[in-house]
Amino acid sequence: MIDRSIQYNSRKDHLQMDTSFIKGVVVPILTICDKDEKIDEAKQRAQVDYVIKGGVTGILAFGSNGEFYMLEEDEMERGLKIMVDQAAGRVPVYFGIGAISTKKSCRLAKMAVKNGAAAVSVLQPMFLKPTYDELYNHFKTIAESVPETPMLLYNNPGRVGYTLSAKLVEELAHNVPNIIGMKDTSGDITQT
């Protein structure tokens, strides 16, 4: 993940949260499961140690590489607890949210914060194409559900079939205090 975080501190209501940890290489870690589709705790812990030893500055749990879509929420919570425990403060753990509904996304964001995630990264909804206003409200509502936690937008048009517009990203960044950055995998340099 490239550091593209932006803070707009000119607004009086902007939350002053610590975003100093959002930098460097944040690896989207794999989720290692056994034949019963349960997270293999020993292997997951070993992978956390491996990437930290390799020099990463953060771990993204349950991003696209982490195959979030194949796990039940309780297993994601268990996996996050394992990764946060194993990271033991050496690097921050980010939590990837890739749910279609706003309600489920808010529930996952709250669960992630409760279990030690330093930030959340939110993919735009897949399998449908929301209007501008629907997408704006989706991201805003999720951010407001965890107001003291940094939130990164995740633009992945290859997975969802549409891109986040520059106008949408700019409006969210200016109007929602804890939306502080974005991971963009569009490959479109005009989006930066």
Question: At which residue positions do the language-model features occur?
Answer:
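Compositionally biased, low-complexity repeat tracts
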Residues: 7-9, 20, 59, 177, ...
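Short, Lys/Arg-enriched N-terminal segments with co-localized hydrophobic residues
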Residues: 3-16
